[in-house]
């Protein structure tokens, strides 16, 4: 099964190198975007139709939210989100103002994009949410993975939730992540 991989904000497709090497699927297509220029719609447009045969969409962080949108593509046969802000980011006005990024506001709690994702149907395909449950950020006063609060990754779901003992970035180099993805692929494809 082919993989469509969408990286997180302020990252690149290089972040998937370990998973590409270790997972059973060796046919990966990565969507690259530039967070300084591309907005939510540009990233979606770069992702839609890039693979014209059956594939699994895998996204890390913001990329996981884009992967969920791919459920509307007839060729998308499954989705794996990795450390993604499934409920949307819980931001105050100061954080929104200081972020200087349209990507942050696009995935803020109650944004139109998060509402769209929550209102899509996922009953026609399997979804796996891999949640990073280790990490520390002194500015987040609750359990977090170093970037996202735990509750943001688990407060909404449209599939199975599986916790990985890693922080927000280590989860992409975790053997537990490789195992979970391989089991997801083996069980369903």
Where are these regions (language model features)?
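Short, Lys/Arg-enriched, disordered terminal segments
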Residues: 1-2, 49-50, 185-189
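Serine-dependent carboxylesterase/thioesterase catalytic core
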Residues: 3-7, 14-17, 23, 28-31, ...
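C-terminal catalytic-base region of ester-bond hydrolases, centering on the histidine
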Residues: 11, 122-189
